[in-house]
A protein has these predicted regions:
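Short beta-strand segments enriched in small/hydrophobic residues
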Residues: 26-30, 64-80, 185-193
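Amphipathic helical "hinge" segments at domain boundaries
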Residues: 56-128
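Hinge/beta->alpha junction and helix N-cap segments in small-molecule ligand-binding domains
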Residues: 76-86, 104-113, 164-174, 190-238, ...
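Periplasmic-binding protein-like
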Residues: 126-132, 188-191, 223, 244-254, ...
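Flexible loop/hinge segments that line or gate small-molecule binding clefts
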Residues: 132-177, 182, 194-195, 256, ...
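Flexible loop/turn connectors
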Residues: 243-249, 254-337
Length: 337
């Protein structure tokens, strides 16, 4: 059997080699690989030839033939996040079931790296992009509008773009409204940059409005900013407790920052105090296991990954009855309030 030698010196099996060994035409091998009709006898011979030779179909050749690489670019803000891991699990479930693979890019919460990866993916062989979005700047909007492959956003509602998101304002309003009736004393708030429309701006505004609906004001002097991390929540809470030792409760924009605030309260007021004095967002499983559950908001992160990926692939695959790229708002659930 004839084998070609690649530039790396490794023997490369070609389709014609499989055909020669199986005693069939190259066209028959191609039909077998693409699920076309072929007799049982020929199919078995081709299967055995592939197993004997270790033949692997070239993804580049498939892309040239079909116009599809079966690759989806996925851009996430960080990989050490429970919410992101749930989202990517949902994405992976759908991609695997429908014959696609994932190329994962981690931005470390850097908005400029989101733009770099958007440019990289659309100029390299991916069929579409899923962006787990954080900050949406004018540059982001231009990049999304001009993207040459279909793109779906998760986590932000951007006008004119395909999005799967949760209503952060509504969820935060409900949380603030519920907490106002059970917290005696001053309430502080640790948020994130409001350049992040969903987690920063909408959650703070919604929480403040929820308190205000029952006559409780959020003192601007008791608002601090963190950076999504446990350490930033801890540092902000320690600073709040030093300048306002009579603070009764600290609401946080994420469960991770709430874990840091909980630790700070335990250090200042005694072990076990923190779990009764903080709230978060995200329903973190690890924090729930440690505390029994703090007041928080549960989002269907896995569902958002599933829905966004199905939306994208239905468009790419031309699934009948699907309306293509659109905006989808998912529900939420208050926990432990």
């Amino acid at each position: 059997m004839v084998k070609a030698i690649s530039t790396t010196g490794v023997l490369v099996v070609k389709m014609k080699d499989v055909a020669e060994l199986a005693g069939v035409s190259s066209a028959a091998v191609s039909r077998y690989l693409n699920g076309g009709y072929i007799s049982t006898d020929k199919a078995e011979r081709i299967k055995q030839a592939i197993e004997l030779t270790g033949y692997v179909r070239s993804s580049q050749a498939r892309a040239l033939r079909t116009g599809s690489t079966k690759l989806i670019g996925v851009i996430v803000p960080k990989i050490n996040s429970e919410s992101v891991s749930r989202i990517t699990a949902g994405i992976g479930q759908v991609l695997g079931r429908r014959g696609y693979q994932m190329l994962l890019a981690n931005t470390d919460n850097a908005a400029d790296r989101e733009l770099e990866y958007l440019d990289l993916f659309q100029n390299h062989p991916v069929d579409g992009i899923v962006l787990v979005a954080t900050m949406i700047t004018d540059e982001h909007r231009r990049a999304i509008e001009s993207c040459r492959v279909p793109i779906v956003l998760i986590g932000q509602n951007v006008e004119g773009a395909a999005c799967v998101y949760h209503d952060d304002y509504e969820a935060a309003f409900e949380l603030g409204h519920a907490l106002a009736g059970r917290v005696d004393g001053k309430i502080a708030y640790i948020g994130v940059t409001e350049e992040d429309r969903a987690a920063g701006y909408d959650r703070r505004r919604g929480f403040e409005a929820g308190l205000g609906a029952v006559g409780v004001a959020l003192d601007p002097s008791l608002i601090r900013l963190g950076s999504f991390t446990l350490d930033s929540g801890y540092g902000a809470a320690r600073e709040l407790l030093s300048v306002a030792p009579d603070v009764s409760f600290i609401a946080c924009a994420t469960d991770t920052m709430a874990a840091g605030a909980l630790r700070a309260i335990d250090e200042v007021r005694g072990v076990g105090e923190g779990m009764h004095r903080v709230s978060g967002f995200g329903d973190n499983a690890f924090l729930r296991a440690l505390t029994g559950g703090i007041p928080t908001v549960h989002y269907g992160y896995l569902t958002s990954g599933v829905e966004a990926t199905n939306m994208l692939l239905n468009t790419l695959d031309g699934v009948e009855g699907e309306s293509g790229l659109k905006t989808l708002k998912l529900g939420h659930q208050l926990m432990n309030v």
